[in-house]
Curated annotation (Swiss-Prot):
GO biological process terms on file: translation
Name of the protein described by the UniProt record: Small ribosomal subunit protein uS14
The protein's assembly and partners: Part of the 30S ribosomal subunit. Contacts proteins S3 and S10.
Species this protein is from: Acinetobacter baumannii (strain AB0057)
A single cellular component GO annotation: cytoplasm
InterPro entries with a match to the protein in the record: Ribosomal_uS14, Ribosomal_uS14_bac/plastid, Ribosomal_uS14_CS
Keywords: Ribonucleoprotein, Ribosomal protein, RNA-binding, rRNA-binding
Keyword GTP-binding: no
Family: Belongs to the universal ribosomal protein uS14 family.
Its job: Binds 16S rRNA, required for the assembly of 30S particles and may also be responsible for determining the conformation of the 16S rRNA at the A site.
Amino acid sequence: MAKKGMINRELKREKTVAKYAAKRAELKATIANVNASDEERFEAMLKLQALPRNASPVRLRNRCGLTGRPHGYFRKFGLSRNKLRDTVMQGDVPGVVKASW
């Protein structure tokens, strides 16, 4: 299981990303707007750089909902491969069966 601090850090990042999402989108649109003046675009670029580092969605990491494990994550289920296997074998995930061919 991942450390509680790592899980909490990731949750804090998610909140920060959500908080600044609209402002980031607005600044990025201004930067990409070719009709805006160079001064406006440069000013928007500086404001974007001044935002918190954790406000960028790139810094988010998918983690298992049960253990917090960062690797082997299945987006469809929100679980790591280990816990997904356990829950499927117990029959907790409907419609998923072991492969046999």
